Amino acid sequence: MIQQESRLKVADNSGARELLTIKVLGGSGRKYANIGDIIVATVKQATPGGVVKKGDVVKAVVVRTKSGARRPDGSYIRFDENAAVIIKDDKSPRGTRIFGPVARELRDSNFMKIVSLAPEVL
């Protein structure tokens, strides 16, 4: 569960390394984001020469959470870290590569480009 002020690792090569959540999109009083949800965040750490800079406000989709997600068959998928991928307004990733595994739930949320770029889909 990602909420306001949560810090996430960035799982792409857009130039950002860490994000701070500003808002969870979807509904007026929504508090938590899970895998596949879109957040508004600011870049807290960035690598030199990247597409995004420190202080930029970006949209991102959550691809890994420590709290995990429940599947329809009753199983759970859980990761070691909270991570997100920075996206454009048309839901395509800003970077050209995705690092680390992503959850299968992204396929249900129509993030097919992220799923196809990911090295592993769990």
Curated annotation (Swiss-Prot):
Residues annotated as transmembrane: none
SUPFAM superfamilies linked to this entry: Ribosomal protein L14
Pfam families xrefs: Ribosomal_L14 (PF00238)
Coiled coil region boundaries: none
Superkingdom classification of source: Bacteria
GO biological process: translation
Molecular functions per Gene Ontology: large ribosomal subunit rRNA binding; structural constituent of ribosome
Cited InterPro entries: Ribosomal_uL14, Ribosomal_uL14_bac-type, Ribosomal_uL14_CS, Ribosomal_uL14_sf
GO cellular component: cytosolic large ribosomal subunit
UniProt keyword terms in alphabetical order: Ribonucleoprotein, Ribosomal protein, RNA-binding, rRNA-binding
Role, per record: Binds to 23S rRNA. Forms part of two intersubunit bridges in the 70S ribosome.
Subunit structure of this chain's protein: Part of the 50S ribosomal subunit. Forms a cluster with proteins L3 and L19. In the 70S ribosome, L14 and L19 interact and together make contacts with the 16S rRNA in bridges B5 and B8.
Family listed: Belongs to the universal ribosomal protein uL14 family.
Name of the protein this chain belongs to: Large ribosomal subunit protein uL14
